Curated annotation (Swiss-Prot):
Binds 1 Mn(2+) ion per subunit. This is Phosphoenolpyruvate carboxykinase (ATP). GO terms for biological process: gluconeogenesis. Keywords: ATP-binding, Cytoplasm, Decarboxylase, Gluconeogenesis, Lyase, Manganese, Metal-binding, Nucleotide-binding. The keyword Lyase applies. It is found in: Cytoplasm. The gene is pckA.
Length: 527
């Protein structure tokens, strides 16, 4: 049955000049002609997103509809908005789009496993946003396109400004999900990441109903078919660490875990570019080519050379490109059951070990805690690192209660006998301002040892406060780096800082999950 949105949209798309499923070259050409961006010397399209250079979580809403009212975990992440307000907003957005000379439509999929994929349609006011959608979502074959029937529609009108008094929003910016109308409305922001993350939120609602765990993680596979998952918030190293020349990338950010195995929800990568270098991240560097979308990168107008060290517009500079741009990427993005899971955190206190082994209960505890430091630039208003506990390493995108996802994870770890590691890509030798960021070469060496089974052969000691198992040695990593206390000049300062962080873990868990005492027992202990 067609929703009202689809009926109204069909009328509009018939009345306006609409470009359906344009190839990359056409979209790049039109974006440049329309003044939406400029080409770099490598042929990538660089677009500036204005004042919104990150997501706007305070402007995200879910329509409070009867069919989902009792399922949604309502609160600051999933703010309710009435059906009446949604309908008023939708009507005004569609009327606004009707006044446009040109619109752009992409038809594709979310979910590489055909059993679980969601056919989607993305309607854009901007050509470059449509190019972004084409690069980030799964592109259909000609046969699939001919038979394509959208089950969820994203309508993105960045220049439309909401009126909070009329539309029930917090500001002129809005990201509104309606599960009954199968529609996402986005406006008042030009930050393209809102498209990708709104569809991820949709999948986080729909997949668990089919016994599939949706995950904010990257995934890759070794030459022997061994699959690894990397969980972590923005800036913790998911994209970087999963782009491993000795392994094959399944995907860099969003996956589902079913009884069939792991599958990429997307068809592209959305890599952070700040301080990007050919030496540090050769795969990402080479992926920035014709068809790639750069967001908010400082590009020299005269030479068209991108300056990735510059944070002129934001620290949250990005590159969006199809997963095929990574050599050896797995196409379609499906793999077997995972062997190893890595939780990534960027600990700004310099307290957590660079790598430690977790049992199932500890894995569920750290999954529910989702600790990291909020990295500057990925959200508006964050310019210095802050402690953040983001449930399941992805709380902004979870419509259901977090324990639903944690219990699914625990069950799958048990069933598949998966080994879980916690890796700190953050600070060592002290907190931010005193210590330094963990060397990427060390982190890579530790992750490699975890994936190839070398960490199964070494001795471990339990961390006195956090209870996790810390290896006493690791190939290609100095032993003193493995014990964070050893890297601090003043051991008493470390002890105080560690106790402080542990107390924050405990306080966060008790506040959010008062009924999960069995999992809480796997957390840190303060003497």
């Amino acid at each position: 049955m067609e929703t009202n949105t689809v009926q109204k949209l069909t009328d509009i798309l018939g009345a306006t000049k609409v470009y359906h499923n344009l190839p990359v070259a056409n979209l790049v050409e039109m974006a440049v002609k329309r003044g939406e961006g400029i080409l770099t010397d490598k042929g990538a399209l660089n677009a500036l997103t204005g004042k919104f250079t990150g997501r706007s979580p305070k402007d995200k809403f879910v329509v409070d509809e009867a069919s989902v009212h009792d399922k949604i975990n309502w609160g600051p992440v999933n703010q309710p908005i009435s059906t009446e307000k949604f309908q008023a907003l939708q009507q005004d957005v569609l009327q606004y789009l009707q006044s446009k000379d040109e619109l752009f439509v992409f038809d594709g999929f979310a979910g590489a496993d055909t059993t679980y994929r969601l056919p989607i349609r993305v309607v854009n006011e901007f050509a470059w946003h449509n190019l972004f959608a084409r690069q980030l979502f799964i592109r259909p074959s000609e046969e699939e396109l001919a038979a394509h029937e959208s089950e969820f529609t994203v309508i993105y009108a960045p220049n439309f400004k909401a009126n909070p008094a009329v539309h029930g929003t917090n500001s002129e910016t809005f990201i509104v999900l309606s599960f009954e109308q199968k529609t996402v409305l986005i406006g008042g922001t030009e930050y393209a990441g809102e498209m990708k993350k709104s569809i991820f939120s949709v999948m986080n609602m729909l997949l668990p109903e089919r016994n599939v765990l949706p995950m904010h993680c990257s995934a890759n596979v070794g030459k022997d078919g061994d699959v690894a998952l990397f969980f972590g918030l923005s800036g913790t190293g998911k994209t970087t660490l999963s782009a491993d020349p000795d392994r094959f990338l399944i995907g860099d950010d969003e996956h589902g875990w079913s009884d069939n195995g792991v599958f990429n929800i997307e068809g592209g990568c959305y890599a952070k570019c700040v301080k990007l270098s050919e030496e540090g991240e050769p795969q990402i560097w080479k992926a920035i080519q014709f068809g790639t979308v750069l967001e908010n990168v400082d590009v020299n107008e005269a030479t068209r050379v991108a300056d990735y060290d510059s944070t002129k517009y934001t620290e949250n500079t990005r590159a969006a490109y199809p997963v095929e741009a990574i050599p050896g990427a797995v196409i379609p993005g499906v793999g077997g059951q995972p062997n190893v899971i890595v939780f990534l955190t960027a600990d700004s206190f310099g307290v957590l070990p660079p790598i430690s082994k977790l049992n199932k209960e500890q894995a569920m505890y750290h999954f529910l805690s989702g600790y990291t430091s909020k990295m500057a630039g990925t959200e508006r208003g964050v310019t210095a690192p802050q402690t953040e506990f983001s449930t399941c390493f992805g709380s902004p995108f979870l419509p259901l209660h977090p324990v639903v996802y944690a219990e699914m994870l625990g069950k799958k770890i048990d069933e598949r006998k998966v080994q879980v590691y916690l890796v700190n890509t953050g600070w060592t030798g002290g907190p931010v301002g005193v210590g330094q960021r963990m060397k990427l070469s060390y982190t890579r060496a530790m992750v490699t040892a975890a994936l190839n089974g070398e960490l199964e052969k070494v001795d471990y000691v339990a961390d006195e406060i956090f209870g996790v198992q810390v290896p006493t040695s690791c190939p290609n990593v100095p032993a003193e780096v493995l014990q964070p206390r050893n890297t601090w000049a003043n051991k008493e300062d470390y002890d105080k800082q560690a106790a402080d962080l542990a107390a924050r873990f405990i306080e966060n868990f008790e506040k959010k999950f008062p009924n999960a005492a069995d999992i809480a027992n796997a957390g840190p202990k303060v003497k």
